[in-house]
Structures are given as C-alpha cells and as structure tokens.
C-alpha cells in the first residue's frame, strides 16, 4: 500500500497496483496463491498453474456463453495431474462434487484430487471426500 494517511476518522491509502488490490480484497485469491507457491516450492511438480479455466467441450464459441470451470491450482507430478480446489470458507457438498466431476472428466484415470481449506470440515464431508478420493489439506 502507498500514500497511507491516518486521522481521527479515516485511514486512507492507495494500492500499489490493481493486481495487489484484487488479491487483498479477495481472500480466496490469497489461499490460491499460498497453495500454488507452497506446492511449487516443494520441487515435486513439473508444472504448476493457478486459476486454470477448462472448457467442457473444447470448442471456442466466440461471444456465446460457454460451459467452463476454473481449477484453482493445477499441478503435474510427472504425468499425474493434480487438481486442487481452494475453499476459504465453509466447505459444502457442491464443492466436493464440482472438484470430483471436473477432475475425473479432465484428469484421466490417475488424477489426484485435493481440497485446500482454511476452516474445519464436518466429519460427514470429510467422509464424503475420502469416498470420492479427495485428499483434504488444512491450510493456515
């Protein structure tokens, strides 16, 4: 932040760039970046990407609305794809089903699925994740 000023009623400041502003205002963005950097720095992965958009039919439809999903963090460990969904709030059933559906459709037979979460997950959702082959990672 730049141009910080404080008085009795207000704290005023400017962001150093639009990207920094976006990251600081979107808590999910920070979790995605944290997850990305920790995985990338591990050295286990040959490729690491954040915010990957996947087009379900692979056809570019111009201006028309197309069915897309975003994978928060996508990795390759050798030839094994790893799909990671980051949840900064409560994890619900839809989060698990979306990760499972997208990873199974585009990841192939050996895909690995991870859910990076910041809040505790209920035992029922943890069991469901285990049944779906989703590894839950608690991020701090």
Question: Model segments located where?
Answer:
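Intrinsically disordered, low-complexity Ser/Thr/Pro/Gly-rich regulatory segments
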Residues: 1-140
């Amino acid at each position: 932040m730049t141009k910080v000023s404080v008085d009795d009623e207000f704290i005023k400041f400017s962001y150093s760039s639009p990207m920094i502003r976006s990251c600081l205002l979107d808590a999910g963005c920070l979790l995605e970046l944290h997850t990305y950097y920790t995985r990338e720095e591990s050295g286990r992965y040959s490729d690491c990407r954040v915010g990957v958009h996947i087009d379900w039919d692979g056809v570019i439809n111009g201006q028309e609305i197309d069915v897309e999903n975003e994978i928060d963090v996508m990795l390759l460990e050798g030839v094994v794809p790893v799909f990671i969904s980051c949840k900064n709030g409560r994890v619900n059933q839809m989060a698990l089903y979306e990760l499972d559906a997208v990873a199974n459709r585009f990841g192939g037979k050996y895909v690995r699925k991870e859910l990076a979460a910041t809040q505790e997950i209920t035992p029922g959702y943890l069991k469901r994740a285990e049944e779906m082959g989703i590894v839950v990672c608690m991020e701090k």
